[in-house]
Amino acid sequence: MRNFSLSYVEKYAPSRQQIKTYLLKKYLKQSISSVKKQNIIDLIDVVLSDLEKTKFISDKFYSDSKAKNLIQRGTSINKIRNYLISKGIQDRYIKETINKINENNEDQDFFSAIKICKKKRIGPSRTEVNRPLFYKKDISLLARNGFDFETSKKVMDLKKDDYLKIINLL
């Protein structure tokens, strides 16, 4: 079991919960009649605690690295929070990561929304003629990406010149 978990860690750099799910699926598929399910779960917990002691897995590191990666892609803070929750990261690590993001950049959502606009070619990156036609559609796209209404409106109301200046800074 330790070998399976080490190969999985080497390949994917997962969170604790992801390894636990992987090992449960792997060993419950085999359905060995002589071994009870509770024994498998206990063994998995022992392997996971051993991996944490040897620093092969760390939910804090996972949380920080995934958040950094998602920010570079232009993901909102709400979406990052929900992603980390879905991966089984503890609340304290999520709060630390979000606080670290806010310390580094006060208005991170604004810059992430700008990145989304550039990538999807919406909002201020559209031609001036088409912007009013697609306003609602663009606002809803930003909302689906986890941005609040104020941030979306602030980005959508940017002038083309200001938008280009910000893009050059990013």
Please provide the spans of the model-predicted regions.
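An alpha-helical, amphipathic repeat domain used for nucleic-acid recognition
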Residues: 1-170
